[in-house]
Curated annotation (Swiss-Prot):
Coiled-coil ranges from the UniProt annotation: none
TM ranges: 12-32, 39-59, 66-86, 99-119, 142-162, 178-198, 214-234, 248-268, 286-306, 320-340, 353-373
One GO term describing the cellular component: plasma membrane
Keywords associated with the record: Cell membrane, Membrane, Transmembrane, Transmembrane helix
Subcellular location, record wording: Cell membrane
Topology within the bilayer: Multi-pass membrane protein
Record-given protein name: Uncharacterized protein YhgE
Encoding gene (name): yhgE
Family statement: To B.subtilis YrdB.
Primary subcellular site in the record, as a coarse category: membrane
Superkingdom classification of source: Bacteria
């Protein structure tokens, strides 16, 4: 691809765009998001999408078509952001933040697929075929993105060196400016990004050199992947498909192999070259592997459908089915280009297939971030339908999945709350209430009387007085699972041979053990230690041992080291 001619005015405009992007993101995140979280969900994605498309595509700010594309991108991003905001309302902050990052990844993929079409519509000279320009644009956009990451990384490394050197002589101004001043961080990121894009777009020959390096690597990998493809497909008749169906990750592995085969072929198959860069036997190997690629997709679809039939739809399975659809279209397109040539160079049809696949993926990504293919809704509806039809039992209802599924999941949890059959199990009820109301709801139910009534006293141990129960509720989080009848067991043992028995609380629902000791001076009980409960120690085993008198203590074989009165704990596995 030839160097892009950018006028001085366009370059200054791009620099201003980068600075404005940093400034707007700073205002949205540092100032406005604290008042209303919607500023981040709506403002940041729309701002970054708008400015990124402008930086990657602009040739002249006077092009009306450019502003039409930018308006379309801005409106579409706002629409998808609105849908994300509606989904994540009421979701816990950590999950909402993860959903926003996932949305950012979707936007990045959409941008990489849409940019070649925008750039092609804005180019001044139409001296190459549509696919040839598309192929070059995808390469350049991906490598420009790589240059952006490298430029920002190197810039911040230099700034880190700068600040650390001045810290050596007691000057902390630069460290504060570079790494603790929000406006400087955002403006620097925007400026460096704009400069990196200008450099990469005006020095296309350097980008072409990097492209050739990666193409050579793909040229060496494709025969190896093709050999793997053929060897595995030859092995299948001897092992049978049943071996695949037993593995959860089978569909993912098969789709990954098919994707590698197709993407490497798309990389190596330069539309400017008339033939493949291999000798006869290797060409035959690669073409044969491409012919069997649809078989991998069909087998992956079969393995995936088995899981859907057995367990219903989930977010991952829906995405897997969409990946099957894309790879099936892609692989069958390559299959037809090899088998049904009619004297035509396969690269012509393969180019059309690649263009169609790029549009298909773009449409799917947009639909996934809209009500049409809402993966959360589909997953929750499938899960609840299986429960209501009796295919899933109450114990098979996944509260965690519902909790992480936004509005739809919360509505499903509310319906389970009124389900007497589901709520009759104390543990399920506790998990459900915790998912709906948070841990604070359970902690508020913890009281001295509730603990005294529900904690099981092991045989041979004495029921504590009110002083002990008062000590327990000082940290309600550690004992909130003990509000269920017999969920926790209390055992008395003298662990330090001082004549005063310590009390050990076994919280089996939380897999933890808490040791309490009595302070004779303050006349109070204190939590001395907390550790994880080994899987080998069950409630039944503990109660049986207490009943049979098999509870005791074992002195440690290794003693602690004392250095001039200072004690060094020696904890060795025995």
């Amino acid at each position: 691809m030839d160097n892009v001619e950018l006028s001085p005015a366009t370059r200054w405009g791009m620099i201003a765009t980068g600075l404005l992007q940093g400034l707007v993101c700073y205002l949205l995140i540092a100032w406005l998001s604290g008042k209303n979280h919607s500023w981040i969900v709506y403002g940041v994605p729309a701002t970054v999408a708008f400015s990124s498309v402008l930086l990657f595509s602009v040739i002249s700010f006077k092009q009306k078509r450019l502003w039409g594309w930018l308006a379309l991108v801005f409106i579409a991003t706002l629409g998808m952001s609105g849908w994300l905001k509606w989904q994540t309302d009421g979701m816990n902050p950590w999950r909402a933040e993860k959903a926003l990052w996932d949305f950012g990844c979707y936007l990045l993929l959409m941008a990489m697929l849409l940019l070649p079409w925008i750039q092609q519509s804005l180019r001044i000279r139409n001296d190459s075929s549509r696919y040839r320009y598309f192929y070059q644009s995808v390469w350049h956009n991906v490598l420009i993105l790589l240059v952006i990451f490298l430029a920002n990384g190197l810039t911040w490394l230099v700034l880190l060196l700068w600040s650390e050197l001045f810290k050596l002589v007691g000057i902390t101004f630069f460290n504060t400016l570079f790494f603790a001043t929000d406006w400087f961080i955002y403006l620097t990121l925007g400026l460096v990004t704009a400069l990196a894009v200008i450099l990469a777009r005006t020095q296309s020959r350097l980008i072409d050199s990097i492209q050739k390096l990666f193409t050579l690597i793909a040229t060496g990998l494709l025969p190896l992947v093709s050999l793997l493809t053929l060897m595995f497909i030859i092995t299948l008749p001897f092992t049978g498909l049943s071996a695949i169906s037993r593995h959860i990750s089978a569909a993912g592995l098969l789709l990954t192999l098919a994707f590698l085969q197709l993407i490497l072929m798309a990389i190596v198959r330069d539309p400017q070259k008339a033939s493949l860069p291999w000798t006869g036997p290797l060409r035959c190997l690669i073409k044969t592997a491409l012919l069997v690629a649809p078989l991998y997709v069909f087998v992956a679809a079969w393995a995936l459908w088995l899981r859907v039939a057995q367990y219903g739809w989930t977010v991952d399975r829906l995405q897997g089915v969409l990946a099957v659809l894309v790879l099936l279209v892609w692989s069958l397109g390559y299959f037809v280009s090899i088998v049904w040539r009619k004297g035509q160079n396969p690269v012509v049809l393969q180019g059309k297939v690649n263009l169609a696949v790029s549009l298909l993926v773009l449409v799917i990504l947009v639909l996934l971030n809209s009500p049409v293919l809402d993966s959360m809704r589909i997953s929750v509806n499938s899960h609840m339908a299986r429960y209501q039809s009796g295919k899933n039992t109450s114990d098979q209802v996944t509260i965690y999945m519902l909790e992480q599924s936004g509005r739809y999941g919360r509505a499903a949890l509310e319906s389970l709350k009124s389900d007497a059959g589901f709520m009759k199990d104390p543990k399920r009820a506790r998990d459900l209430l915790m998912a709906l109301d948070g841990e604070q709801h359970l902690q508020q139910q913890v009281s001295e009387k509730v603990l005294a009534d529900n904690v099981l006293i092991a045989p041979g141990s004495v029921k504590p007085d009110a002083t002990f129960w008062s000590a327990l509720i000082q940290d309600r989080y550690n004992v909130m699972t003990c509000i269920e009848k017999d969920a926790c067991v209390l055992v008395e043992q003298d662990l330090n041979s001082d004549g005063q028995a310590e009390r050990i609380l076994f919280a089996f629902n939380d897999d933890r053990v808490i040791v309490y000791g009595f302070d004779s001076d303050r006349k109070e009980w204190d939590a001395l230690d907390m550790s994880l409960l080994p899987n080998e120690i069950t409630k039944e085993k503990l109660l049986t041992a207490a009943k049979d008198g098999k509870l005791g203590t074992k002195p440690k074989a290794w003693r602690d080291l004392v250095v001039d009165g200072e004690r060094l704990n020696v904890n060795l596995n025995e």
